[in-house]
Every structure is written in structure tokens, then in C-alpha cells.
Curated annotation (Swiss-Prot):
Provenance organism: Chlorobaculum parvum (strain DSM 263 / NCIMB 8327) (Chlorobium vibrioforme subsp. thiosulfatophilum)
Residues given in the record as carbamoyl phosphate binding sites: R55, T56, R105, H133, Q136, G261, P262
Pathway in which this enzyme or protein is active: Pyrimidine metabolism; UMP biosynthesis via de novo pathway; (S)-dihydroorotate from bicarbonate: step 2/3
GO cellular component: cytosol
Protein name (Swiss-Prot/TrEMBL): Aspartate carbamoyltransferase catalytic subunit
Single GO MF descriptor: amino acid binding
């Protein structure tokens, strides 16, 4: 593996290798004090972000530092991109500064694959358009594996704006490769055409989807969808597809809930569901475990691509 631009085409053995490596790093993150071998000392990683990010950018930066690497943080608004510089010129200039790898977030689908065609440095996709977000899917899968002890045979329901979600696509690819069953749940206007051809079950009723599932991955609803004709209103979306205590009370069994963040509270997920770490109740929020696992997964990816 020379790059990580997506989970499409990656064999189960590679995914398991990354997950096992990440699980070891997560144990290290939970120790006091944190101590890691400086495997990437004298390496320099360019964090090239053309879109805003909190969790992804900071966790890549922490992951690099834990492994002894330095980082260069790039944001489009404060760079020559604001003066018209192209993506390829940006990458070539950073490469001329002798950076060792690129972590790229970009609004255009396929941007990460394009960058692999103009550099021989490792490229890690931190989210490109509606295409993929592979490290988010890996941290979600690690969170689920840690909770259940396995992935094979699990029934995972992905809830929300499937149509525009790179997180959904990467999770479907990774989870199916590892043997999980996948369902998606959303209003029909937020489902891609021919989504069933990906081998997933489709629900438009949340109660039925919850009854089917072992775990739920909730997606962020981009609020402009309410004015773009995709949903009647935020209130109606929340009533039909928001995860609330009341919906879990009807289910009457425990279910872990994941969310990639940031959360639109009281729209896609209620405060009580988002903030509940342990029972009582029937939902168990895994949001903070996801954040910790995000650092561990990104350490594993950097290790796999850069350690000699």
C-alpha cells in the first residue's frame, strides 16, 4: 500500500492489519504517560486542507507528533490558493520543500487520486467531495470491533444523508469487506439512485431500521439540505429520522450509536442520546471513543505508509 485514497479495492487482510495496529496504538493512548517509539522522526507531513476540519486535522497532527514526525498545516484561505494557485502547483511546491507525505482534504471527488498521479510521496485522503473518507471509516470500524469483539455478521445501519456522504461510502466498502451486513436509512430524496446495487438493505422507516440493526452510524445532515428541496424542513426530518430516547425506548435493547461529527444536536441526534456514555437506557454513545480511535487509526496509517 503506497497511498490511502479510499477503502475501495483494499483486501480484508490490509484492513485487519491497519485495525490491529491501531488497536495497539489505542492502548498506548490510554496509558499514562503516553510513550511511543519515534518511528517517524525526521519525517515531515503536509496537512493540506481545502475544507474546514477539527477532529480530522487535529488527530492527524497528534498522530504525527506521537510518532515523532513534524507537520506543516495548510489552509486554503491563508495560502496562495486564495491568489489562484492550482492544486497541482500547491502539491509540487510542497514536494519541492521535501515533505514526506500529504494528508489531503478537498471539496472535489477524486482529488486525492489525482494527487497520487503528480507525486511519488504517500497521499492520505482526509475526505474528498462525496467520494471517500477512509480514515473515518477505519475509526468507525475499530470502534465497532472494540465494542462487539468482531465485525463479521454484524448488522450496521447508516442513517441520514447517504446521497452526499463520503463517510457512508467508505463505511459501506470497509464493513462489507469485513463481512458485516449493511442497511441505509433515509428519506428517499437523500438516497443515491441504485443504492441497492452496493449490496445494502434500504429502509425509509427508522423504527424498522433500528429493529433490524445491531448498531447505528448517524451522519451529519448538511443544514442547507432543508432549503435545497431534499427535506421538507429540519423539524420534519428530526421527527422522522432523528435518534431520540423515545425511539430507543420502543426498541428496548442496547445499541451503540456512532457519529462522525460535528453533530447537529436535536436534529439528527438528541442531546440525551449523544451524551449518554453508559446505560441506564437503551442507547450507548460511542462518540468520544471514536475521537480517541481516530488518533490511533491515523497513527496506524502513517506508520504503515512511512515507517521503514
Amino acid at each position: 500500500m503506497n497511498h490511502l485514497t479510499g477503502l475501495f479495492g483494499l483486501p480484508a487482510s490490509t484492513l485487519v492489519e491497519l485495525l490491529d495496529l491501531a488497536a495497539g496504538y489505542r492502548e498506548g493512548l490510554n496509558r499514562e504517560p503516553e510513550t511511543f517509539a519515534p518511528l517517524l522522526s525526521n519525517r515531515r507531513i503536509a496537512l493540506v486542507f481545502f475544507e474546514n476540519s477539527t477532529r480530522t486535522r487535529f488527530s492527524f497532527e497528534l498522530a504525527a507528533r506521537h510518532l515523532g514526525a513534524g507537520t506543516l498545516s495548510f489552509t486554503a484561505a491563508s495560502s496562495s490558493v486564495s491568489k489562484g494557485e492550482t492544486l497541482s502547483d500547491t502539491i509540487r511546491n510542497l514536494e519541492a520543500m521535501k515533505v514526506d507525505a500529504f494528508v489531503l482534504r478537498h471539496p472535489s471527488s477524486g482529488a486525492a487520486d489525482f494527487v497520487t498521479s503528480i507525486t511519488n510521496r504517500p497521499v492520505i485522503n482526509a475526505g474528498d467531495g462525496t467520494h471517500e473518507h477512509p480514515t473515518q471509516a477505519l475509526l468507525d470500524i475499530l470502534t465497532l470491533r472494540s465494542y462487539f469483539g468482531k465485525i463479521e455478521g454484524l448488522k450496521i445501519m447508516i442513517l441520514g444523508d447517504i446521497l452526499h456522504s463520503r463517510v457512508a461510502r467508505s463505511n459501506i466498502l470497509g464493513l462489507k469487506t469485513l463481512g458485516a451486513e449493511i442497511a441505509v436509512c433515509a428519506p428517499s430524496t437523500l438516497l443515491p439512485g441504485r443504492i441497492d446495487q452496493l449490496g445494502v438493505q434500504v429502509f425509509t422507516n427508522l423504527d424498522k431500521a433500528l429493529a433490524w440493526a445491531d448498531a447505528a452510524i448517524v451522519l451529519r445532515l448538511q443544514l442547507e439540505r432543508a432549503t435545497g428541496g431534499y427535506i421538507p424542513s429540519l423539524e420534519e426530518y428530526s421527527a422522522g429520522y432523528g435518534l431520540t430516547d423515545e425511539k430507543f425506548d420502543r426498541l428496548k435493547r442496547l445499541m451503540p450509536v456512532l457519529h462522525p461529527g460535528p453533530i447537529n444536536r436535536e436534529i439528527e441526534i438528541s442531546n440525551m442520546v449523544a451524551d449518554r456514555i453508559q446505560p441506564p437506557g437503551y442507547s450507548s454513545s460511542m462518540l468520544m471513543e471514536q475521537v480517541t480511535n481516530g488518533v490511533a487509526v491515523r497513527m496506524a496509517v502513517l506508520h504503515r505508509l512511512l515507517a521503514k
